[in-house]
Amino acid sequence: MAATGGRRCRRLEGETARAVLANVDTLLFDCDGVLWRGEAALSGAPAALGRLAAAGKRLCYVTNNSSRTRVAYTEKLRRLGFPPAEPRHVFGSAFCAARYLRQALPPGAAAYVLGGPALSAELEAAGIPHLGPGPAALPGPAPADWAQAPLEPAVRAVLVGFDEHFSYAKLCQALRYLLRGPDCLLVGTNRDNRLPLEGGSAIPGTGCLVKAVETAAEREALIVGKPSRYIFDCVASEFDIDPARTIMVGDRLDTDILMGNTCGLTTLLTLTGVSTLEEVRGHQESDCPARQGLVPDYYVDSIADLLPALED
């Protein structure tokens, strides 16, 4: 792949792959589109991670998905045949959001949550009082009624994650909490606009919900998920991480690769998910610094391509 003077992406194979992996202690993996699709592991992925673990590499899992807890991810990894993982090796946006609020909120403060059971579970584990998960109905037939619904005095943050019950009623309540003043934080798990499904279809992602709340509140949310470096800071707070000896492996340029590049990691794109080699070429040939930040150091067709470099 020819470059114009900026970042240059190369296929990771052969002796280059062996040399790169030999100089790495930690690999951070996105999950969906990298390790599995839905409930099926991608071919060769469990074997590749098994070889990496056997070689003494630290494996961590960094995902924007807020609909699973850390424990649920470890169970899925086990079920799909990946090396055993402890919850402390999983960094989902639900866990990272709870960690952020535990640091940012005063004792006893609560969060109003647009999200599901996993987000609620991580907040509970972090000791953060919260309300909001589940369906919500408007409190009356007229806008005047909607503006008079009871508010919980302890709420000092609005947290937006993936919420299948997102509604106008919830949007109204979120806005009313945020209008109480700038001391009420607005936090989002991620800005992913779409969640790709099998067969090329997609559903709206959490980013759509975050944008709705931002638009109503006329405020910008603090995002804890990729490409924010906060999620990497969560990893670095748990483990002694040397960025120069760490690889971020992902399938999305605008989240996985951008975060890795921002944090000074080696970045590896796998072509089993969202982003394509054509997109990489377009960014690589651009003189725009922002687009250059989306160019990975290396790419592979799939994680299974690492297997030859891991042979004894």
Swiss-Prot record:
Entry binding sites for Mg(2+): 30, 32, 251
Gene Ontology cellular component annotations, sorted alphabetically: cytoplasm
Chemical reaction(s) catalysed: O-phospho-L-tyrosyl-[protein] + H2O = L-tyrosyl-[protein] + phosphate; sn-glycerol 1-phosphate + H2O = glycerol + phosphate; sn-glycerol 3-phosphate + H2O = glycerol + phosphate
Enzyme Commission code: 3.1.3.21, 3.1.3.48
Pfam families the UniProt entry points to: Hydrolase_6, Hydrolase_like
Record site feature (Important for substrate specificity), residues: 195
Metal-binding recorded as keyword: yes
Database matches in InterPro entries: HAD-like_sf (IPR036412), HAD-SF_hydro_IIA (IPR006357), HAD_sf (IPR023214), PGP_euk (IPR006349)
Descriptive protein name: Glycerol-3-phosphate phosphatase
Organism of provenance: Gallus gallus (Chicken)
Gene responsible for this protein: PGP
